[in-house]
């Protein structure tokens, strides 16, 4: 852009630099460079407005740091609201599924893999056999067997929560039984609610799960099960944490489970016989399908 010139001292007869050389090297970098007034300001558009209008070019408004901060706050607020809405929606779905008669929780999808999980109760009858695969081996799925001990634990948890506050997800967490799924609890809770209505005489409709009455009648119904808040006088208490379950090695296709019953806080109701007992869990049994098919594939 510029150039350097050597200025000699013409008064020196020897032709040597009077000042020793570099002192007389004059930089001319600024010669010919535009000044600040000659430069195009950054706020000015490079394309003239008339030309932009001819090509339908609409100039965008320049963004400031305040615009960036405002957009960031709006994005964070929308993310927080969507997270809260999803958690509230999950709780509402749990209550609707457990309270509406005729709803089929078996058609719900598992949250981890998104695959449909068909779960059959112990009172379901053996179905027709399905086709075998190419290797001649039939697929096997675990089926939950609701034993009287496991049903007793279910009844105690429902009595603690109250029949109106009991939802499948909370019951599953308080029961703390290894291998028990939300679909198992939702199906059993629906049948148990119909059973309670029948023994109270609140409904005359036919029970499609009449085969479960023998299991339900094996355990007395606690009086607090009919209350809104169960044994907590309308308020959900904080239960004592349950010890982790220890699976027992089984034989063949059987899996054993054993643990200790949780002692719930009863808020003054110390004589409640359903809250202070120790209990054993039922067993999770993997039944082979009869005739080469899976009973869940009906």
UniProtKB/Swiss-Prot annotation:
Biased composition (Polar residues): 209-227
Subcellular location: Nucleus
DNA-binding region positions on the chain: 138-197
InterPro entries linked to this entry: Homeodomain-like_sf (IPR009057), LUX/BOA-like (IPR044841), Myb_dom (IPR017930), Myb_dom_plants (IPR006447), SANT/Myb (IPR001005)
Record-annotated disulphide pairs: none
One GO term of the biological process aspect: circadian rhythm
Sequence ranges of Acidic residues compositional bias: 10-20, 122-131
UniProt cross-references to SUPFAM superfamilies, sorted A to Z: Homeodomain-like (SSF46689)
Basic and acidic residues bias locations: 104-113
Organism encoding this protein: Arabidopsis thaliana
Annotated region (Disordered), positions in chain: 1-26, 79-143, 206-232
Keyword Transcription: yes
GO cellular component, one term: nucleus
Protein name as it appears in the record: Transcription factor BOA
Function: Transcription factor that is a critical component of the regulatory circuit of the circadian clock. Binds to specific sites on CCA1 promoter leading to CCA1 activation. Is required for the rhythmic expression of other clock genes such as LHY, GI and APRR1/TOC1.
GO molecular function: DNA binding; DNA-binding transcription factor activity
The UniProt record lists the keyword DNA-binding: yes
Keyword terms: Biological rhythms, DNA-binding, Nucleus, Transcription, Transcription regulation
């Amino acid at each position: 852009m510029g150039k350097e010139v050597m200025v000699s001292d013409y008064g020196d007869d020897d032709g040597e630099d009077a000042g020793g050389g570099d002192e007389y090297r004059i930089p001319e970098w600024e010669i010919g460079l535009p000044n600040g007034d000659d430069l195009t300001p950054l706020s000015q558009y490079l394309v003239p407005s008339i030309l932009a209008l001819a090509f339908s070019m609409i100039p965008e408004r320049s963004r400031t740091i305040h615009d960036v901060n405002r957009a960031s706050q709006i994005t964070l607020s929308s993310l927080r609201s969507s997270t809260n809405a999803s958690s509230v929606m999950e709780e509402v779905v749990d209550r609707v599924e457990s309270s509406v008669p005729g709803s089929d929780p078996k058609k719900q999808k598992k949250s981890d893999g998104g695959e449909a999980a068909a779960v059959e109760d112990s009172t379901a009858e053996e179905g027709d056999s399905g086709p075998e695969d190419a290797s001649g081996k039939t697929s096997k799925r675990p089926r939950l067997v609701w034993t009287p001990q496991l049903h007793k634990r279910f009844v105690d948890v429902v009595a603690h929560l109250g029949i109106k506050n009991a939802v499948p997800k909370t019951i599953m967490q308080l029961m703390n039984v290894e291998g028990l799924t939300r679909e198992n609890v939702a199906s059993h809770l629906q049948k148990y609610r119909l059973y309670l209505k029948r023994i109270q005489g609140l409904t005359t409709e036919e029970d499609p799960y009449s085969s479960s009455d023998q299991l339900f009648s094996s355990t007395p119904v606690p009086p607090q099960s009919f209350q809104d808040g169960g044994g907590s006088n309308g308020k959900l208490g904080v239960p004592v944490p349950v010890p982790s379950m220890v699976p027992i090695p089984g034989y063949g296709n059987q899996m054993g489970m054993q643990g200790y019953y949780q002692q719930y806080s009863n808020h003054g109701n110390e004589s409640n016989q359903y809250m202070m007992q120790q209990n054993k869990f039922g067993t999770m049994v993997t039944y082979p399908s009869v005739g080469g098919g899976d009973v869940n594939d009906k």
